[in-house]
Swiss-Prot record:
The keyword Cell inner membrane does not apply. Homodimer. Binds to TubZ filaments via the C-terminus of TubZ. DNA is not required for binding to TubZ. This is DNA-binding protein TubR. GO terms for molecular function: DNA binding. Induction: Probably part of the tubR-tubZ operon. It comes from Bacillus cereus (strain ATCC 10987 / NRS 248). Although this has the same function as TubR of B.thuringiensis subsp. israelensis there is little sequence homology and the dimerization interface is different. The keyword Repressor applies.
Amino acid sequence: MKLLSNISMSSSEIIDVLCENLNDGIWALRVLYAEGAMNKEKLWDYINQYHKDYQIENEKDYEGKKILPSRYALDIMTARLEGAGLISFKAIGRVRIYDVTDLGNVLIKELEKRVEKNN
């Protein structure tokens, strides 16, 4: 197996890759950043509510579609964000409490800067 030791990326390039591939995961980061740590069921509800509020406010054509229509979609989203190191969880009994990691906070700050720069 050949190691990829000759590949180097700056932190800015890493953040760029994460931003480009975040997709709907931005909603989970946004919720956890704004509301703090929470369990998966609550996260699911909040993500759908935040997205609904955004659509009503910005697009004026909310059709009632949820961004995360199923628990399966939520599981995929949280697994992707965990794998990228953007969120983490603590198990309390059988409940997982999700929160934004330091890397997730760096990404959120970078996204905020980019939005301000584009406005």
